[in-house]
Amino acid sequence: KWKKEITEIAKLNNPKKILDVATGTADIAINLSSIKNCRIYGIDISERMIKIAKQKVESQNLNKNISLEIGDAENLNFSNNFFDILTIGFGIRNFIDLDKGLKESYRVLKKSGYIIILETSLPKKKFIKVIYLIFSRIFIPIIGKLFSNNPKAYKYLQESTEKFYSVNDVVKKLSHTGFREIETRSKLLGASTIYVAKK
């Protein structure tokens, strides 16, 4: 649902070139490929993720629409003012230097281009936040152990979400980078947030 929302936001701006940063297994990139006359570029620092992503893209015959390569969000291998839209789904939490990553995103976007970020966040309302923290600290690790081959990933999700910047802090960082018209959309009672900002 959120991936479709990202695509709908992107579609409003009639993009010709979109970069999906931290593309993972290309779920967002594949969704974005439904936009007509638009080329999708996906990068991820993980060679394993890119390999899986390429297999998925190939199996859906989307090679003509989507280009995938290994790449670092904090050192993008693209020229200035190249993309109309830049998307990042559950990726900025893993940036080593968020400021540097946002500056790189800003650099490769065309003037009046948009950045669309989807990221986990802590709910703002105290009551919901307490319930969320109890759930994430107790149940997420249990779910990870019971249903996943990689329970450490679930534990990391919980810990990294708690340590990550607040929604207000991310907005400030976007503004400090130079982005304007910053909008936030709260999802799952604040457990995830979509950020939309214009260069």
Segments the model singles out, each with a brief description of its role:
Residues 1-16, 31:
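Conserved alpha-helix/loop element of class I SAM-dependent methyltransferases that forms part
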Residues 17-75:
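Class I SAM-dependent methyltransferase SAM/SAH-binding core
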Residues 45, 97, 120:
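Short beta->alpha hinge that forms the Motif I/post-I loop of the SAM-binding pocket
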Residues 74-86:
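A short acidic, Gly/Pro-enriched loop at the edge of an enzyme's catalytic core
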Residues 84-97:
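A short SAM/SAH-binding and catalytic strip from SAM-dependent methyltransferases
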Residues 99-111:
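A short glycine-rich, Lys/Arg-flanked "PGG" loop and its adjoining helix->strand segment in the class I
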Residues 118, 122-173, 177, 183:
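C-terminal alpha-helical "lid/dimerization" subdomain adjacent to the S-adenosyl-L-methionine
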Residues 175-199:
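Core SAM-dependent methyltransferase catalytic element
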